Amino acid sequence: MLGVCHCTNCKRRTGSAFGISTYFAKDAVVRQEGDTKVYAFHHAAQNHDQERHFCPNCGTTLYWFVSSLPDKIGIAGGCFDGEGLPEPTYAVSDAKRVSWLSLPSRWQVWAE
């Protein structure tokens, strides 16, 4: 699963107009090395709990867990190097998308 999120939370997390999120089965991802800092909270707008892991040195969001996707791990799109990241296929929280950004018509789009 690869998509973009326009919620206020993702905008603040990335410092951008949206966040790029990739989701994989938890058992398909192997953490290489290093410690992370954790920020846990309840995302009221999407009604789920979230646990974010980020680099304690530079602050980059690395991955997260969402209670509404218990078998998945989310990895920030910016963590992928080069051209290895394919085009997203969906957008969520589209009601909060900035007005100057348009999306491809082939994407699935959810207002919330």
How would you label these PLM feature ranges?
Residues 1-112:
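A short Gly-Trp-Pro
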